[in-house]
Amino acid sequence: MANHRIDRVGMEIKREVNDILQKKVRDPRVQGVTITEVQMQGDLSLAKVYYTIMSDLASDNQKAQTGLEKATGTIKRELGKQLTMYKIPDLVFEKDNSIAYGNKIDQLLRELDNKS
């Protein structure tokens, strides 16, 4: 039962953070950032927010990380307005490499298919 609540809160935070990034945060460093997953700690005090960015350049990834860290206060304040929770969890942003990994595997499979 508690695990279900943790999952629901994570999904709601994911939806709201995506919305906040699109509508409220004007920092150009976070343009093109998409939230892919939110993992909540058991006591709902910490949320790991995984994101992807369209660019593969390391400099763009670093800029996006810096922009997200700078916007954390704004995002948390807006979450406080949208969510009915006693305490809004602390947000930690991490780059999600699963999309790039999946694309690499897909490319390898296509290469194998072309060879046969």
Swiss-Prot record:
Does the entry feature the keyword Disulfide bond, yes or no? no
UniProt-listed InterPro entries: KH_dom-like_a/b (IPR015946), RbfA (IPR000238), RbfA_dom_sf (IPR023799), Ribosome-bd_factorA_CS (IPR020053)
Q: Does the keyword Hydrolase apply?
A: no
Tell me where in or outside the cell this protein is found.
Cytoplasm
Molecular-function GO terms, alphabetical:
ribosomal small subunit binding
Q: Which GO terms describe its cellular component?
A: cytosol
Alphabetical UniProt keywords: Cytoplasm, Ribosome biogenesis
**Major location, coarse class?**
cytoplasm
Cite a single GO BP annotation.
Answer: maturation of SSU-rRNA
The record's Pfam families line, in alphabetical order, gives: RBFA
Any idea what job this protein has?
One of several proteins that assist in the late maturation steps of the functional core of the 30S ribosomal subunit. Associates with free 30S ribosomal subunits (but not with 30S subunits that are part of 70S ribosomes or polysomes). Required for efficient processing of 16S rRNA. May interact with the 5'-terminal helix region of 16S rRNA.
Outline the subunit composition: Monomer. Binds 30S ribosomal subunits, but not 50S ribosomal subunits or 70S ribosomes.
Family assignment from sequence similarity: Belongs to the RbfA family.
Q: What is this protein called?
A: Ribosome-binding factor A
